[in-house]
């Protein structure tokens, strides 16, 4: 954002949960127009104090608990952060006159699509049919954003993206998990038979789309953001093995996730038609850039895969 709009001031609010890492922001912290606040978005008093002091013109709401497996294990924190936190931010916008609110959401709110119907895609008109506690919490927040737009006149938009990948991705997610495990010659745990399909979106393409929506999206509208990169999970794992020169015998099939969605696929026609956005990164190119980043930044992720993450990994995969 600062590289594209150096005249803007960027305020970053983050609770720094297990997935937060200040080292990720080292570059931004050097910029004179960047400020960081370690704050829980559910802390109404702290959020109001920031809004009163800084008077932000717009809010882009990325903050969320986002890992499906953790939501299955303990849904409560997902409901608190993803729903109540969204309410607090919107209340702050209304109270302090913030002009724009953008909700960053997920295609998972639509549920899933059958594997044998490649012609079917999620559009903005697809009914919400969440499958997991995570996606239900995001769907609830989306509905709340729509209600605040209609009831209170909040100038709000929503985007629903497909699976992101790229640098700084927390290693509990599929692609960084497989890269980290492969580099350590550890088993590569794949749910079920690995046939579940996801549409992959490079993180920089996602950021470009959000910037366009923030500045040109129509109030009250939903915009789907997809990468046109549908891949089976097992095929991604095999590509990572090939890129790193690791044997496929590291692949270990584990008990499937409860309620595992079969296929996600997004139709991004609306954002292309209205705002001119298209993904620029081919999956093969984005995956190579991602792998190269993890190879060059081992200190960043090796420091993470210890402590709480190690305990979580054992709970998720040890006996499956």
Q: Residue ranges of each PLM-predicted region?
A:
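N-terminal Rossmann-like NAD(P)+-binding domain of SDR-like oxidoreductases, especially those catalyzing
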Residues: 1-164, 289, 294-297, 303-320
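C-terminal substrate-binding subdomain of Rossmann-fold SDR/epimerase-dehydratase oxidoreductases
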Residues: 3, 39, 176, 182-320
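Short histidine/acidic/glycine/proline-rich micro-motifs that form metal-
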Residues: 16, 163-166, 196-197, 257-258
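Gly/Ser/Thr-rich beta-alpha loop segments that engage phosphate groups in nucleotides
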Residues: 22, 87, 113, 137, ...
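A glycine/serine/threonine-rich, flexible loop-to-helix segment
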Residues: 28, 116-117, 171-179, 255
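Residue-level recognition of oxygen-bearing side chains
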Residues: 46, 77, 84, 127, ...
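Conserved active-site helix of classical SDR/Rossmann-fold NAD(P)-dependent CH-OH oxidoreductases
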Residues: 86-87, 139-146, 176-179, 207-208, ...
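The catalytic Tyr-centered alpha-helix of NAD(P)H-dependent dehydrogenases
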Residues: 118, 130-137, 167, 171-175, ...
């Amino acid at each position: 954002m600062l590289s594209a709009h150096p005249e803007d001031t960027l305020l970053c609010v983050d609770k720094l949960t297990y997935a937060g890492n200040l080292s990720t922001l080292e570059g931004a912290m050097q910029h004179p127009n960047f400020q960081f606040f370690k704050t829980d978005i559910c802390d109404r008093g702290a959020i109001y104090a920031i809004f009163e002091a800084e008077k932000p013109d717009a809010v882009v709401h990325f903050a969320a608990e986002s890992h499906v497996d953790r939501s299955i294990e303990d849904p409560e924190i997902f409901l608190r952060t993803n729903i109540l936190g969204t309410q607090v931010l919107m209340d702050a916008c209304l109270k302090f006159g913030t002009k724009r609110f953008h909700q960053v959401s997920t295609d998972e709110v639509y549920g899933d699509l059958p594997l044998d119907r490649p012609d079917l895609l999620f559009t903005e008109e697809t009914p919400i049919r969440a499958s997991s506690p995570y996606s239900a919490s995001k769907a609830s927040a989306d509905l709340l954003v729509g209600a605040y737009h209609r009831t209170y006149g909040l100038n709000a938009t929503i985007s629903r993206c497909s699976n992101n990948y790229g640098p700084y991705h927390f290693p509990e997610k599929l692609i960084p998990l497989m890269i980290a495990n492969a580099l350590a010659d550890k088993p590569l745990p794949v749910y079920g038979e690995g046939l579940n399909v996801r549409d992959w979106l490079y993180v920089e393409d996602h950021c470009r789309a959000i910037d366009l929506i923030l500045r040109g999206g129509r109030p009250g509208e939903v915009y789907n953001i997809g990468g046109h990169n549908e891949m089976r999970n097992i095929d991604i794992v095999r590509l990572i093995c090939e890129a790193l020169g690791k044997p496929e015998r590291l692949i270990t099939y584990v008990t499937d996730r409860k309620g595992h969605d079969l296929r996600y696929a997004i139709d991004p026609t609306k954002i292309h038609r209205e705002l001119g956005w298209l993904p620029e990164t081919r999956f093969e190119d984005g995956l190579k850039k991602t792998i190269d980043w993890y190879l060059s930044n081992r200190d960043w992720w090796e420091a993470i895969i210890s402590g709480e993450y190690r305990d979580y990994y054992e709970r998720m995969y040890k006996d499956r």
